[in-house]
Amino acid sequence: MEIENEQICTCIAQILHLLNSLIITFSDDDKTETGQSFVYIDGFLVKKHNNQHTIVNFETYKNKMKVSDRRKFEKANFDEFESALNNKNDLVHCPSITLFESIPTEVRSFYEDEKSGLIKVVKFRTGAMDRKRSFEKIVISVMVGKNVQKFLTFVEDEPDFQGGPIPSKYLIPKKINLMVYTLFQVHTLKFNRKDYDTLSLFYLNRGYYNELSFPCPGTLSRNSECQAERQLYDAYFH
């Protein structure tokens, strides 16, 4: 009788040990990452973790979120992300200036595929001819699915040119000093749509270009010219 009791106890202990292992395994698979937070920006879900901001797919990431966070974003509109997900091009237009001010950008090369007409990112296996006619864009990389990556490029909503010139906030301000005004003849500048897009991208990445451009080595005259350029930059964008 004692032997039977011992066998029963042993079986129960083994069952409990097995159940405990299953519980631990389940908890490890379902656990959430600590020290992370989420924010909704213009149709995208952005994860902040270790001071890094990353766009994530809510549908594939929600099981890793806290219940409170998941409930918070369940009714959010992720149309912009869905648009990027369903876009056949690797390069996707994005009108959200807030997104580009919040997430680090990078420079990538793209080309138009002759067969499909789609814009594709230059990869290791991209042919020499496609590389030769490629162009660079400042982008935010987004993993929209498993092994599926898209690149967002900032393109502001089209202004209404039929209603008149570009709004006054885009005009050269009058606070530029006389030296810069005369040197660059800014009063004669006229911007088309391509110029406007270039200036917008320059503004979004002004810190990057600022580090590349200043200080300017060289002669005194070149330094003076750089100071003038800096004054123009500060006057236009601040």
From Swiss-Prot:
Pfam families: Sir1 (PF11603)
Regulation: induction: Down-regulated at low calcium levels.
Family affiliation: Belongs to the helicase family. Yeast subtelomeric Y' repeat subfamily.
Name under which the protein is recorded: Putative uncharacterized protein YPR202W
Organism from which the protein derives: Saccharomyces cerevisiae (strain ATCC 204508 / S288c) (Baker's yeast)
Organism classification: Eukaryota, Fungi, Dikarya, Ascomycota, Saccharomycotina
